[in-house]
């Protein structure tokens, strides 16, 4: 900010890092993040013709609908330039995930329709639209924890006193294989 001298890094997944008036520090942090993230691996998504799965379709688990709807009601998905940060989906079979779509405002019901994504080791094919950047990470987490079939992710401040593990994320871009591995490694039971 040229008026206040405040600097910050806003990364592609809209997380904010290094909020400071020390320009040299924020530039060092930015260079460090860029070097770390440049080593991340990604699987390119091929988008093919197809039809989206409507949010209220009976194939969409009722539990996923209820949780996402509740999160929306609680303000979990904050819009910035009419796009919300986060993603959600479900895994109905071994190599298939239905994921939320990229660059949507999940506060609008029509933006919650899901895209079918088929995975193999070296490719992922989406049908009808581009899936969330986090689709590969969703798939990796649900593959590691096969007892679960749904996943919901959003950015929000921690509740004071919350006993929830936090994984460092700044070196992993959302959608990278390393992001999925980092997230899966930090998963644990609560409650």
PLM features: what roles do these ranges have?
Residues 1-191:
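Glycine-rich flexible loops
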């Amino acid at each position: 900010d040229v008026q206040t001298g405040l600097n910050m890094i806003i990364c592609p997944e809209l997380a904010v890092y290094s909020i400071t008036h020390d320009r040299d520090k924020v530039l060092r942090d930015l260079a460090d993040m860029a070097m770390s993230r440049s080593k991340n691996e990604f699987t390119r998504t091929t988008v093919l013709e197809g039809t989206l799965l409507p949010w209220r379709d009976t194939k969409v688990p009722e539990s996923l609908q209820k949780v996402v709807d509740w999160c929306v009601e609680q303000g979990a998905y904050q819009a910035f330039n009419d796009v919300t940060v986060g993603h959600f989906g479900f895994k109905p079979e071994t190599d298939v995930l239905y994921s939320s779509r990229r660059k949507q405002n999940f506060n609008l019901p029509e933006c919650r329709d899901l895209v079918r994504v088929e995975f193999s080791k070296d490719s992922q094919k989406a049908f009808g639209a581009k899936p969330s950047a986090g689709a590969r990470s969703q798939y990796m987490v649900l593959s590691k924890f096969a007892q679960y079939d749904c996943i919901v992710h959003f950015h929000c401040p921690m509740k004071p006193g919350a006993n929830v593990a936090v994984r460092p994320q700044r070196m992993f871009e959302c959608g990278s294989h390393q992001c999925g591995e980092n997230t899966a490694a930090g998963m644990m039971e609560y409650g």
